[in-house]
Swiss-Prot record:
Family: Belongs to the germin family.
Task of the protein: May play a role in plant defense. Probably has no oxalate oxidase activity even if the active site is conserved.
Stored Gene3D superfamilies: Jelly Rolls (2.60.120.10)
PROSITE patterns assigned: GERMIN
UniProt-annotated location(s): Secreted, Extracellular space, Apoplast
Protein name, as recorded: Putative germin-like protein 12-3
GO molecular function, one term: manganese ion binding
Residues that, per the record, bind Mn(2+): H111, H113, E118, H162
Length: 229
């Protein structure tokens, strides 16, 4: 009987192990340039025919050496993301990158990347950065923060809420980040909660945030911008 139970556990252990190690699927060939015009729907993109692949599928004149416009952002930041939607050669490679520009006192608001770990390096100015852990057994969510200067590096674990803030009153800041997914996704917390379409019931949000409905209605009436480009 014990032997029988052991063999029943083997597929369960295999399933749990597979789920724990899940990420962007590894490439099974040298190249799989995304064919965005294909009618086939898969997790990611199907491969372009190899005979139609060119060097330009792996190149993008992204101008990441130049500061991006931050004057129109209410958050005071601009995220220029280079993912598989912009660079088809990233398909199946499990990586993307971005440049983030911050106005004085600007921020990249609290957000998560549901499919990626992020590593950031400051290339101009200073940044106050941090992330919050998932719900712990003691009911707490621990905050980890650090002030970074030019050349410093910081990593944000996959799926955790994190932020960056430029503490300077008069100097801009900038960073380059790499992400462990061809399409990491971004969920800006305030935008998702108060700017969803259709809106989340104010009964739900008033209870969740322990405020009255007027406060929720006011927040939902604001313009929640997307600072990702």
């Amino acid at each position: 009987m014990a032997s029988s139970n052991f063999f029943l556990l083997i597929p369960l252990i295999a399933l749990v192990t597979t789920q724990a190690m899940a990420s962007d699927p590894s490439p099974l060939q040298d190249l799989c340039v995304a064919d965005k015009n294909s009618p086939v729907r898969v997790n990611g993109f199907p491969c372009k025919d190899a005979k139609d692949v060119s060097v330009d599928d792996f190149f993008l004149a992204a101008n990441l050496d130049k500061p991006m416009d931050i004057t129109k952002s209410k958050a005071g930041s601009n995220v220029t993301l280079i993912n598989v939607m912009k660079l088809a050669g990233l398909n199946t490679l499990g990586i993307s990158m971005a440049r983030i520009d911050y106005a004085p006192k600007g921020q990249n608001p609290p957000h998560t990347h549901p499919r990626a770990t992020e590593i950031l390096s400051v290339i101009e100015g200073s940044l106050y950065v941090g992330f919050v852990t998932s719900n712990q057994a003691n009911g707490e969510n621990k905050l980890f923060t650090k002030t970074l200067n030019k050349g410093d590096v910081f990593v944000f674990p996959e799926g955790l809420i994190h932020f960056q803030f430029n503490p300077s009153y008069d100097k801009p800041a900038a960073a380059i980040v790499a992400l462990s997914s061809q399409n990491p996704g971004a969920i800006t917390i305030a935008n998702a909660v108060f700017g969803s379409n259709p809106p989340i019931s104010d009964d739900v949000l008033a209870k969740a945030f322990q405020v009255d409905k007027k406060a929720v209605d006011w927040l939902q009436a604001q313009f929640w911008e997307n600072n990702h480009n």
